Amino acid sequence: MSIKVAILGHSQVPQTFHVQNSEISIFRRSGACIHHFDESPLRDILEDRFDLVFLFLGGNDIRADLYDCKPVIVGLKGILLRLKEISKEVRFVAIERRHYSVNNRFGVENAQYEHDRRQINNNLRKFCGRQNIRIVNTTTRWFSDHLGKDGVHFATEAQRELKQKFTNVINLCREQAIQGGSS
Protein backbone atom coordinates (compact mmCIF):
# COMPACT_ATOMS: atom_id res chain seq x y z
CA MET A 1 0.00 0.00 0.00
CA SER A 2 1.36 3.41 -0.98
CA ILE A 3 0.70 6.61 0.98
CA LYS A 4 0.77 10.25 -0.15
CA VAL A 5 3.15 12.42 1.83
CA ALA A 6 3.94 16.14 1.68
CA ILE A 7 6.89 17.93 3.23
CA LEU A 8 6.39 21.68 3.51
CA GLY A 9 8.87 24.29 4.66
CA HIS A 10 12.08 26.24 4.30
CA SER A 11 15.56 25.29 3.11
CA GLN A 12 16.05 22.59 5.77
CA VAL A 13 13.48 20.50 3.87
CA PRO A 14 15.25 17.98 1.63
CA GLN A 15 15.09 18.91 -2.07
CA THR A 16 14.47 15.30 -3.00
CA PHE A 17 13.28 12.47 -0.84
CA HIS A 18 12.18 8.92 -1.57
CA VAL A 19 10.69 6.23 0.63
CA GLN A 20 9.51 2.90 -0.75
CA ASN A 21 5.73 2.64 -1.23
CA SER A 22 5.28 6.38 -0.71
CA GLU A 23 4.46 9.22 -3.07
CA ILE A 24 6.28 12.24 -1.63
CA SER A 25 5.66 15.83 -2.70
CA ILE A 26 8.08 18.56 -1.63
CA PHE A 27 6.79 22.10 -1.07
CA ARG A 28 10.00 23.98 -0.30
CA ARG A 29 11.00 27.60 -0.42
CA SER A 30 14.44 28.75 0.65
CA GLY A 31 14.15 31.38 3.37
CA ALA A 32 10.45 30.66 3.86
CA CYS A 33 8.63 32.41 6.66
CA ILE A 34 5.06 31.96 7.85
CA HIS A 35 3.74 34.74 5.59
CA HIS A 36 5.08 32.83 2.55
CA PHE A 37 2.54 30.05 3.16
CA ASP A 38 -0.01 31.92 1.05
CA GLU A 39 2.43 32.19 -1.87
CA SER A 40 3.51 29.58 -4.40
CA PRO A 41 5.06 27.02 -4.09
CA LEU A 42 3.96 26.58 -0.46
CA ARG A 43 0.24 27.29 -0.94
CA ASP A 44 0.10 24.71 -3.74
CA ILE A 45 -0.10 22.03 -1.05
CA LEU A 46 -3.73 23.03 -0.44
CA GLU A 47 -4.70 21.77 -3.91
CA ASP A 48 -4.36 18.10 -2.97
CA ARG A 49 -5.09 15.57 -0.21
CA PHE A 50 -2.45 13.63 1.72
CA ASP A 51 -2.10 10.81 4.20
CA LEU A 52 0.72 12.62 6.01
CA VAL A 53 2.09 16.18 5.99
CA PHE A 54 5.24 17.47 7.70
CA LEU A 55 5.45 21.22 8.45
CA PHE A 56 8.95 22.65 8.93
CA LEU A 57 8.56 26.43 9.34
CA GLY A 58 9.17 29.02 12.04
CA GLY A 59 12.95 29.36 12.38
CA ASN A 60 13.19 32.12 9.76
CA ASP A 61 10.48 34.11 11.54
CA ILE A 62 12.71 34.67 14.58
CA ARG A 63 14.40 37.99 13.84
CA ALA A 64 15.94 40.87 15.78
CA ASP A 65 12.73 42.90 15.31
CA LEU A 66 10.53 40.10 16.74
CA TYR A 67 9.50 41.56 20.08
CA ASP A 68 6.59 39.21 20.62
CA CYS A 69 6.43 35.54 19.62
CA LYS A 70 2.64 35.56 19.52
CA PRO A 71 2.33 36.32 15.76
CA VAL A 72 4.65 33.40 14.94
CA ILE A 73 2.71 31.08 17.25
CA VAL A 74 -0.66 32.18 15.86
CA GLY A 75 0.62 31.84 12.28
CA LEU A 76 1.97 28.33 12.81
CA LYS A 77 -1.23 27.23 14.56
CA GLY A 78 -3.28 28.53 11.64
CA ILE A 79 -1.15 26.68 9.10
CA LEU A 80 -1.31 23.45 11.11
CA LEU A 81 -5.12 23.66 11.27
CA ARG A 82 -5.29 24.24 7.50
CA LEU A 83 -3.03 21.23 6.93
CA LYS A 84 -5.30 19.07 9.10
CA GLU A 85 -8.09 19.80 6.59
CA ILE A 86 -6.12 18.18 3.74
CA SER A 87 -4.28 15.38 5.54
CA LYS A 88 -5.10 12.43 7.77
CA GLU A 89 -1.91 12.99 9.80
CA VAL A 90 0.13 16.15 10.40
CA ARG A 91 3.56 16.42 12.00
CA PHE A 92 5.18 19.66 13.15
CA VAL A 93 8.97 19.70 12.92
CA ALA A 94 10.07 21.60 16.04
CA ILE A 95 12.00 24.78 15.35
CA GLU A 96 15.66 23.83 15.28
CA ARG A 97 18.57 25.33 17.16
CA ARG A 98 20.93 27.61 15.27
CA HIS A 99 24.29 29.23 15.97
CA TYR A 100 24.31 32.65 14.35
CA SER A 101 27.55 34.45 13.71
CA VAL A 102 27.87 38.14 14.60
CA ASN A 103 27.03 39.19 11.02
CA ASN A 104 23.89 37.21 10.30
CA ARG A 105 21.15 38.29 7.94
CA PHE A 106 18.43 38.32 10.61
CA GLY A 107 20.42 40.38 13.10
CA VAL A 108 19.21 38.12 15.90
CA GLU A 109 21.51 37.22 18.76
CA ASN A 110 21.91 33.55 19.65
CA ALA A 111 20.41 34.08 23.12
CA GLN A 112 17.33 35.82 21.70
CA TYR A 113 16.86 33.18 19.01
CA GLU A 114 17.12 30.39 21.59
CA HIS A 115 14.66 32.12 23.95
CA ASP A 116 12.11 32.73 21.20
CA ARG A 117 12.58 29.26 19.71
CA ARG A 118 11.88 27.63 23.06
CA GLN A 119 8.85 29.81 23.73
CA ILE A 120 7.34 29.03 20.32
CA ASN A 121 8.09 25.29 20.53
CA ASN A 122 6.70 24.99 24.08
CA ASN A 123 3.49 26.74 23.10
CA LEU A 124 3.12 24.61 19.98
CA ARG A 125 3.77 21.38 21.89
CA LYS A 126 0.71 22.11 24.03
CA PHE A 127 -1.38 23.09 21.01
CA CYS A 128 -0.28 20.08 18.99
CA GLY A 129 -1.09 17.77 21.89
CA ARG A 130 -4.67 19.07 21.94
CA GLN A 131 -4.94 18.78 18.15
CA ASN A 132 -3.47 15.26 17.88
CA ILE A 133 -0.50 16.60 15.90
CA ARG A 134 2.79 14.95 16.76
CA ILE A 135 6.16 16.68 16.97
CA VAL A 136 9.29 15.67 15.05
CA ASN A 137 12.15 16.71 17.32
CA THR A 138 15.17 18.41 15.77
CA THR A 139 16.02 20.44 18.86
CA THR A 140 18.54 18.13 20.51
CA ARG A 141 22.14 19.08 21.10
CA TRP A 142 23.10 16.43 18.49
CA PHE A 143 21.39 18.41 15.71
CA SER A 144 22.91 21.71 16.85
CA ASP A 145 26.34 20.06 16.94
CA HIS A 146 25.88 19.04 13.29
CA LEU A 147 25.19 22.38 11.65
CA GLY A 148 26.93 23.58 8.52
CA LYS A 149 29.49 26.40 8.46
CA ASP A 150 26.71 28.99 8.30
CA GLY A 151 25.41 27.88 11.72
CA VAL A 152 21.89 27.61 10.31
CA HIS A 153 21.58 24.66 7.94
CA PHE A 154 22.08 21.03 8.88
CA ALA A 155 25.36 19.45 7.83
CA THR A 156 25.34 16.14 5.94
CA GLU A 157 25.04 13.99 9.07
CA ALA A 158 22.07 15.96 10.39
CA GLN A 159 20.39 15.93 6.97
CA ARG A 160 20.68 12.14 6.96
CA GLU A 161 19.23 11.95 10.48
CA LEU A 162 16.32 14.22 9.52
CA LYS A 163 15.56 12.03 6.50
CA GLN A 164 15.68 8.97 8.76
CA LYS A 165 13.20 10.59 11.16
CA PHE A 166 10.89 11.36 8.22
CA THR A 167 11.30 7.81 6.89
CA ASN A 168 10.43 6.30 10.28
CA VAL A 169 7.24 8.37 10.56
CA ILE A 170 6.25 7.60 6.95
CA ASN A 171 6.75 3.86 7.47
CA LEU A 172 4.77 3.95 10.73
CA CYS A 173 1.88 5.80 9.07
CA ARG A 174 1.91 3.37 6.14
CA GLU A 175 1.81 0.39 8.55
CA GLN A 176 -1.07 1.97 10.46
CA ALA A 177 -2.93 2.53 7.18
CA ILE A 178 -2.42 -1.11 6.23
CA GLN A 179 -3.64 -2.32 9.63
CA GLY A 180 -6.60 0.07 9.51
CA GLY A 181 -7.53 -1.11 6.02
CA SER A 182 -7.46 -4.79 6.95
CA SER A 183 -9.68 -4.60 10.02
Residue ranges: model-predicted function:
Residues 62-63, 99-104, 143-146:
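Short acidic/His/Gly/Ser-rich catalytic and metal-binding motifs that mark active-site loops
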Residues 2-81, 99, 115-118:
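Conserved SGNH/GDSL esterase-like catalytic core that processes O-acyl groups on lipids
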Residues 147-183:
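Histidine-centered active-site loop/cap adjacent to the catalytic His
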Residues 85-90, 133:
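A short helix->loop->beta-strand "cap" motif at the edges of active sites that frequently abuts
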Residues 87, 94-99:
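Short beta-alpha junction loops
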Residues 95, 133-147:
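Acidic carboxylate-rich catalytic motifs and surrounding loops in phosphoryl-/glycosyl-chemistry enzymes
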Residues 56, 93-94:
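Alpha/beta-hydrolase-fold catalytic nucleophile elbow
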